[in-house]
Amino acid sequence: MRLENKRTIITGAGPGIGRAIAERFCVEGANVMVAEIETQGGEETVKRILKSGGTAIFQQTDTSKEDSIQCMVECMVSEFGGIDIVVNNAAAFVFGSIEETGPEEWAKVLSVNVIGYANTIKSALTFLKKSKNAAIVNIASVSSFIAQPEFLPYNTSKGAVSQMTRCLAMDLAKYNIRVNAVCPGAIYTRASEQHMDFMGLDHEKGRELFGQDALLKRMGRPDEIANGVLFLASEEASFITGEHLVIDGGATLD
């Protein structure tokens, strides 16, 4: 098993990409904390994992709040004795133009997508330092490095995740902690359905539209992102840090 007994926190592990990561990690032997703000979604992820023979616990967590993150870490250490891997996947999806984006919208997207990522790593760092081969994987986005109309708040936050990943790779290398990012393209999830709703598209037309930019002419699946995250978290990527793995079907190749 590629992650046997690896003690892993995955934030935003309700439906979608986070759930796919949690399930994939458990198949590979990881002991996973499903950290999710929505209790129903998080508990469903754990239920699915336990049913398939994996090891997972649920912790209701609001990553926009530092005390909630600290509670998450304390619970993780109490249950599993330490932390080997952190996957930052929790996300706030806030779209709009500069005129439409006010202080509340900025606070929401930055508190989860940027500050929440940083606080999760900071809170887990003492335990990651004690791990022999610790890894951090931040879920960024192709929106980290491309411009999109009326995506200002979201793209700004994901651009920050990209720089956070690079800077932390430099700062944490002395502790043998690797830090990488995965940049998904158009992936069919509940979040993508919400974006289709924002654009006034029905979901069938939305899938066709969102998939047309990919060279493979379709949207991706959450499990395809999970496979990339698994690679970066595993010993197979032991000499990789500060990198961004783009998984978008070739949509941003140019």
Locate the predicted segments by residue.
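Conserved glycine-rich cofactor-binding loop
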Residues: R7, G14-P15
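Substrate-binding pocket helix/loop in short-chain dehydrogenase/reductase
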Residues: S97-I98, E105-K108, G206, F210
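Active-site loop-to-helix junction immediately N-terminal to the catalytic Tyr of the SDR YXXXK motif
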Residues: T101, A147-T156, C167, H195
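Active-site helix of classical SDR
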Residues: I121, S157, T165
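Residue(s) in the substrate-gating loop at a strand-loop-helix junction
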Residues: S141
